[in-house]
């Protein structure tokens, strides 16, 4: 059956402290999968994700968020795609914290992937950096553990650049027309056709809290990201019926939208610099 990369409140966990193995087992059992899925060939090198996590823990990286895809085929549940967000010890406090996003599965739907990200505490937004900051992919063969550890340090090496770009965005002011343009571009990423967007750019750039009322590029982006990921905005469908935007609850959709929004923000940064 087709993998449905979705997770809900029973398939994800987030804490303000490192997650324990018991918590990971309860919410993301595929991290502990005892073997590869039967569809994988003999060339597939199987290593439980928890082994990778423990090696990363030894290097000072701790998981604070984890989620697992819901699947229609229950036979794939223990092998399904999972995502963890890890932080380096000593880099936990502050308004934003850099993270390593680790994705994997044991059913063939994903290699090991590591992507740089940022977690924003005020709105609990988990951001994903665009491809221009590097994305590490490790296939299921050879010295997986060594390659993943090396990849983690490669991702760690781009955090300074990520932070520099973030601080630059905080210094860039956007007027109302420019914010509208940002919101419009974001809606096109999600819905592709302006005639099918259930909400307006004004709605997607509206802040949900007073801390996000600033008009800089960074904050505008945060407002858009939160409104798109969390959903719940009132609007009208293409047929004119009242509707509400849906939250983005799939791993693949979350990564895709986040990367696209980062690209839009980077384009605005270059345009306004």
From Swiss-Prot:
Protein name per its UniProtKB record: UPF0380 protein YubP
Mutating residue 210 to R: effect? In plasmid IncFII R1
Signal peptide interval: none
Native species: Escherichia coli (strain K12)
Annotated family: Belongs to the UPF0380 family.
Q: Which UniProt keywords apply?
A: Plasmid
- Pfam families, per database record: DUF932 (PF06067)
This chain is encoded by the gene named yubP
